[in-house]
Amino acid sequence: METTAVLRGVRLSEQKGRLVADQIRGLPVERALNLLAFSPKKAAVIIRKLLESAIANAEHNEGADIDELKVSRIYVDRGPSLMRTSARAKGRGNRIVKPTCHILLTVGDKASNKK
C-alpha cells in the first residue's frame, strides 16, 4: 500500500530541494520528520509539510499505521521558471530567473517496499 502527495510550483530550486530529499529517502516517517524538524534549510520546511500531508492521506484513505510507514519515493523535478527583469544602466535590462520545482513524495508500509 502506497500513498502519494504532490506539491507543484514551489518557489525553490530543484537542486536545493534534492539536497533535503536525498537525506530522507528510504527512512521511516518518524525519523524523517525528526530530521526535517531540525534542518535549517527552507526546503526542509516545505518537504516536512508535504510528508505530514502524505501521512495523513495514508491514515485517512488507506487506514495505515504510522509506525509501519516509510518514505519509499521522493522526487524533486524542475518546474517552470519565473522570469523578471532588472533595470540596468544605459537602458539595458538583466533577466532575473526565479526557479520553481515539483515535489512528489510517496509513503508506503514496509511490506510493500520489499517487493
Curated annotation (Swiss-Prot):
Gene3D superfamilies on file: Ribosomal protein L22/L17
Membrane spanning residue stretches: none
GO molecular function: rRNA binding; structural constituent of ribosome
InterPro entries xrefs: Ribosomal_uL22 (IPR001063), Ribosomal_uL22_bac/chlpt-type (IPR005727), Ribosomal_uL22_bac/org-type (IPR047867), Ribosomal_uL22_sf (IPR036394)
Keywords: Ribonucleoprotein, Ribosomal protein, RNA-binding, rRNA-binding
One Gene Ontology term, aspect cellular component: cytosolic large ribosomal subunit
Record-level GO BP terms: translation
Subunit structure: Part of the 50S ribosomal subunit.
Family to which this protein belongs: Belongs to the universal ribosomal protein uL22 family.
Physiological role: This protein binds specifically to 23S rRNA; its binding is stimulated by other ribosomal proteins, e.g. L4, L17, and L20. It is important during the early stages of 50S assembly. It makes multiple contacts with different domains of the 23S rRNA in the assembled 50S subunit and ribosome.
Protein name as catalogued: Large ribosomal subunit protein uL22
